[in-house]
């Protein structure tokens, strides 16, 4: 039997976050994008074993894995396939309906009764590409300008959401975008306050839960 057995374990470097995942302690969670190198050690223990008198062995057993990557911060859990597939199906229908250009105000009179004829001409596109007139060029220019403005706003929203909730392996993590905004005291910084408001609004689902909790 071993005598004078003693072992010490290193303290845990992780804590439980609001999202149910482990995050490193002592790290400011507001700075989602960080460029600090780190190594992750699953456990490490120092064991001092003594046999009899004058026969002492010191053994250190450790099992560590070095990822050689940057600190991985937790993010909100992404939606699963249960939500993804219905959204993709809805996207396909929306795309083709918008491309075809169904005239929803197309109505006919039948004995004084207004009848909708949406599906009667649903294969007729809203833009006739074989038409050669000045009106066609004007309509095309207006369509392109409106499409560029709306798509640009959508891309801007996706870009902002990707910075806040994107993957830890994203390219923007190397740019250190968020930390560049928080120079000096973060609580007095304008960008810090804006980020805090947006995060609070999205975390509380646009404060809709307040009405349900009443």
UniProtKB/Swiss-Prot annotation:
Entry membrane topology: Multi-pass membrane protein
Keywords, ordered alphabetically: Chloroplast, Membrane, NAD, NADP, Plastid, Plastoquinone, Quinone, Thylakoid, Translocase, Transmembrane, Transmembrane helix, Transport
EC number(s) per entry: 7.1.1.-
Subcellular location: Plastid, Chloroplast thylakoid membrane
Entries under InterPro entries matching the protein: NADH_UbQ_OxRdtase_chlpt_su5_C, NU5C-like
Entry keyword ATP-binding: no
Primary site of residence: plastid
GO terms classed as biological process: ATP synthesis coupled electron transport; electron transport coupled proton transport
Keyword Translocase annotated: yes
One GO cellular component term: chloroplast thylakoid membrane
Enzyme class: translocase
A GO term for molecular function: quinone binding
Membrane spanning stretches: 84-104, 152-172
Catalytic activity from the UniProt record: a plastoquinone + NADH + (n+1) H(+)(in) = a plastoquinol + NAD(+) + n H(+)(out); a plastoquinone + NADPH + (n+1) H(+)(in) = a plastoquinol + NADP(+) + n H(+)(out)
Subunit structure: NDH is composed of at least 16 different subunits, 5 of which are encoded in the nucleus.
Physiological role: NDH shuttles electrons from NAD(P)H:plastoquinone, via FMN and iron-sulfur (Fe-S) centers, to quinones in the photosynthetic chain and possibly in a chloroplast respiratory chain. The immediate electron acceptor for the enzyme in this species is believed to be plastoquinone. Couples the redox reaction to proton translocation, and thus conserves the redox energy in a proton gradient.
Family: Belongs to the complex I subunit 5 family.
Record's protein name: NAD(P)H-quinone oxidoreductase subunit 5, chloroplastic
Organism: Brachypodium sylvaticum
Gene field: ndhF
């Amino acid at each position: 039997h071993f005598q004078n057995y003693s072992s010490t374990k290193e303290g845990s470097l992780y804590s439980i976050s609001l999202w149910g995942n482990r995050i490193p302690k002592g790290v400011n969670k507001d700075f989602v994008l960080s460029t600090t190198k780190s190594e992750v050690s699953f456990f490490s223990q120092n064991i001092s074993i003594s046999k009899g008198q004058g026969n002492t062995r010191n053994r250190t057993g450790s099992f560590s894995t070095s990822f050689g990557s940057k600190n991985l911060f937790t993010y909100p859990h992404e939606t699963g396939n249960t939500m993804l597939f219905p959204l993709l199906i809805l996207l396909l229908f929306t795309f083709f309906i918008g491309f075809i250009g169904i005239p929803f105000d197309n109505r006919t009179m039948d004995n004084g009764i207004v009848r909708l004829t949406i599906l009667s001409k649903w294969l007729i596109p809203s833009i006739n590409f074989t038409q050669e007139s000045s009106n066609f060029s004007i309509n095309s220019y207006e369509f392109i300008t409106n499409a560029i403005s709306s798509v640009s706003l959508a891309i801007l929203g996706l870009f902002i959401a990707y910075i806040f909730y994107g993957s830890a392996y994203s390219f923007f993590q190397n740019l250190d975008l968020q930390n560049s905004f928080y120079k000096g005291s973060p609580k007095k910084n304008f960008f810090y306050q804006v980020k805090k408001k947006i995060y609070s609004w999205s975390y509380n689902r646009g404060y809709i839960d307040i009405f349900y909790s009443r």
